[in-house]
Amino acid sequence: MSAQKLVALLLWPLLVACSDQRAAFEIGSRQHSLTLIRVHTFFWERTASYSLVAARMPECMRRHEMGSGGAESRVEVYAPGNDAWILKQGKRLYVVETRTCEGFARLASEPEGGLGPLRGSFQVRSGALTWIAEPKSENSPPAEAPAAQ
């Protein structure tokens, strides 16, 4: 076996180790959604880079960086209302809105009015990032209708 083939064979795991996974929470339709993107650079790392795409097409779509977090982190999505969404990743809280898709901020603490109802969470299941909707209870509010045009 030539040296080039041997080097290529040894480097192969490093080249295929990067994982870029996406999962979407469709709010009212495919055009109104929150999509979590998880980039896990190397299989041996315990962290991944996270970003969120807020979309309400055709009016707006924007990608927001959430930074690094645990590779298997669960990201919960809460709905306080008014096209605002609160994301909880471990102890970190973020707020994003889908009216203009521009608003995004890290919260220092839980809002005074609370997080709102839990709509579901992004989780890694069997190695794949997935959206797991919260089961609807009798007291849960109806799904938000898309904003008026």
Provide a role label for each language-model segment.
Residues 80-149:
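Acidic, small-residue rich beta-repeat scaffolds with periodic aromatic anchors
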Residues 4-5, 19-22, 60-66, 84, ...:
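Intrinsically disordered, low-complexity proline-rich regions
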Residues 4-7, 45-48, 85-88:
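Short, intrinsically disordered, charge-biased short linear motifs at domain edges
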Residues 20-25, 68-78, 117-121:
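Repeated scaffold domains used in trafficking and secretory/extracellular systems
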Residues 1-18:
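Sec-dependent bacterial lipoprotein signal peptides
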Residues 16-67:
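N-terminal export/targeting and maturation segments
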